[in-house]
């Protein structure tokens, strides 16, 4: 899990840098049989997980005509989907006092409510959102 999120973070950093030079970058979340997974996949499912099912998505993401950047594409077994990391609207406690674990518990349903979630574009954008909420109003 952590290594995969590191890849997404790295992709987001490269996306911002690459944009300046007309370079696109993506991440593939493959659904394919590998040496690591072949012992845990049912034998009747294994033929569906050919790596070749992933290559079409990789080729499209690398194509010059594809102007998108920073996408995570799940690909394999004949299935393809864009995947997003999303951020809930969250809960603002303010900066006057540090919240207690009990306060987090009491408002956790608000913290975890994904009904107004938005794509988590990158850390800089997430920080800007937080700073806009907590900045003193002039």
What are these language model-derived features?
Residues 8-9, 15-30, 66-75:
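Conserved Rossmann-fold SDR core element
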Residues 6-9, 53:
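Conserved cofactor-binding/catalytic machinery of classical short-chain dehydrogenase/reductase
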Residues 27, 45-137:
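C-terminal helical subdomain
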Residues 3:
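Active-site helix of classical SDR
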Residues 18, 23-43, 81:
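Flexible, glycine-rich beta-alpha linker
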